[in-house]
Each structure stands twice: as C-alpha cells, then as structure tokens.
C-alpha cells in the first residue's frame, strides 16, 4: 500500500461504482486457479492515501496527487483505470454515486450518476398482463435489463465542480493500458477463461 505525504488534502471522497458480474456460479469456482490477494498491510497517513483493488489503479491515483491533483482528480483517474484493468471493480457501462465532504467549506455533496431506465421503458415492463410480477429475470437478464450508463457523465460532473487538473490528464493512463495492454491478475485470467466463447 502506498502512503503519500501529500499536504493540504482537506476533504474526503467516497466513490462507490455500481458494477455487475452476473453469474450463477459461486465465486470460489471462478477462482479455480487459487489466486490469493497479497497480504493486507496496515498503513496510516495524516495527509492522504490512495488504495484501490488493483495496484495499477493505485499507482495512477498516486501519480495524479503527485502532479498536484486533488482527491477528486485522483478518484476520477482511478475509476477510469479500474474500468480497464479490473472491470468488475469499476466500469464505464454502469453508474454510481459520490458522497463528498469538503472540509474547507464544511459542505457535503452527493452526486448521483446511477444508470437510468431507457426512454422507452414503462412502469409495467416487468409485469405479466394480469399485473403480477414476471419472475423470468426480465429485470436482470437480457435486453430489458439494460440501463443507460451514468458513470462517464457523473465523473465529468465531479471534474467540472471539483477537479483541478485537465480531463485528458485524468484519463491518459486508462487509455494507455487499454491501448497497450497490461499484465492481468490470475483472478481476472480465470474469469476471462471461464466466460470466453
């Protein structure tokens, strides 16, 4: 875990992205290679810290802070990087929300960018003709389960309100990994093999 000596970070950002890995198989089966996460280390800092579920995303967040970006910038860069290197932990095809507390202004903010129902959706699209609920997984599987993604728009809104670095600097690492590749974890390899055609 990286401990940063970044001064003047006076706010806390909590980012929860909505992601979905739909499967009927238990997770233990997906991890048939026996991947075990690195030993958890405990770290503390008075000024700031970056931690994510993937080391490349953590490095990107640290880089953004070291370039003078704020926690909002780092969270945006981390979110886009996770969409590439660990899609189940963050993706641009979903949505989420951000709860923000700015210590300097003592103001809380919430930005909701959850997925939205498509324009042609109806309130009874998951019901049978008699008005009873259709239990055939229509709301979770297939074309009727699709929502309009909100992640990119939500992260853009965070950037416009609170960001300090240019947008292109925040997404450049995600673009780099998408174009040039990266070493995947055994766990992601297992999932890709399990669901390959």
Where would I find each of the regions flagged by the language model?
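Bacterial N-terminal signal peptides that target proteins for export
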Residues: 1-10
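Residue-level micro-sites within transmembrane alpha helices that shape
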Residues: 6-7, 19, 72
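Bacterial N-terminal signal peptides
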Residues: 10-20
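Noncatalytic scaffold domains of N-terminal-nucleophile
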Residues: 24-59, 71-72, 76-197
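Long, structured ligand/cofactor-binding scaffold of large enzymes
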Residues: 63-65
């Amino acid at each position: 875990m990286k401990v940063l000596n970044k001064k003047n970070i006076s706010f806390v950002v909590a980012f929860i992205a909505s992601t979905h890995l739909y499967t009927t198989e238990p997770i233990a089966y997906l991890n048939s290679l026996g991947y075990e996460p690195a030993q958890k280390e405990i770290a503390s800092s008075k000024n700031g810290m970056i931690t994510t579920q993937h080391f490349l995303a953590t490095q990107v967040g640290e880089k953004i802070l070291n370039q003078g970006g704020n926690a909002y910038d780092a969270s945006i860069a981390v979110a886009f990087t996770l969409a590439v290197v660990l899609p189940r932990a963050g993706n641009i095809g979903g949505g989420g929300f951000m709860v923000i507390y700015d210590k300097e202004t003592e103001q809380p903010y919430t930005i909701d960018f959850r997925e939205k129902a498509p324009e042609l959706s109806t309130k009874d699209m998951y019901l049978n003709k008699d008005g009873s609920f259709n239990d055939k997984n229509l709301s979770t599987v297939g074309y009727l389960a699709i929502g309009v993604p909100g992640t990119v728009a939500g992260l853009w809104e965070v950037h416009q309100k609170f960001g300090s670095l240019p947008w292109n600097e925040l997404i450049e690492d995600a673009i780099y990994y998408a174009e040039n590749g990266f070493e995947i974890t055994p766990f992601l390899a297992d999932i890709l093999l399990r669901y390959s055609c």
